């Protein structure tokens, strides 16, 4: 009986070690690859349109732990997540100056374009929670997404170009939406304390379209698909009335990039008619 117990103990211990080693694999393999700046060719976005109360899932359920294929897939996902740490993001931002990719040559056609994700949050004008897609539906929208002051600054260059002397915040062809991503609970708490200060820095007429949304609503791998994972940069989406992403940009904007984006907005306005 003692021999049987010892054998079972050895088996249990070896299984635990194998199980643990399996899930430590992402940490061991977390060697980041150097970021390569490429021009966008394929549409960016999600396959399904946003809808209220949708919750994007991340990771495996308890039952999935016993599914070999799903577990291996999750391990690969974790390898990517561990590799792209905060230090990696900072180094990449410094190397690229926030220009993580180059905008497409032209906008994506409606039948090929993918959807903007569901996001909920509050605006500067109201404490009530709402869904961002509700204000996007039926309109052409230029959306700024940022989490930091530097991301806010460089993404604003696509709206206001001091070199050209143009301010498109009041452009009649579209609406401009600001989405300030709150990274975590600490930042959310700090924002509550400094909300009045933030309101004073944003023109009152912009408060209705300035959203505060928790970044964690969109899981890591979904942010990878949307190309918005680097917290230091700022991003621009052009979204059509059907909630599809038709154009995207990031990082600082040159005069040519500024003009390209607003040319796209003009073309989509004609398409709408």
UniProtKB/Swiss-Prot annotation:
This is Mitochondrial ATPase complex subunit ATP10. The keyword Amino-acid biosynthesis does not apply. Belongs to the ATP10 family. Pfam families: ATP-synt_10. Keywords: Membrane, Mitochondrion, Mitochondrion inner membrane. GO terms for biological process: mitochondrial proton-transporting ATP synthase complex assembly. GO terms for molecular function: unfolded protein binding. Involved in assembly of the mitochondrial F1-F0 complex. The keyword Mitochondrion applies. One of its GO terms (cellular component) is mitochondrial inner membrane. It is found in: Mitochondrion inner membrane.
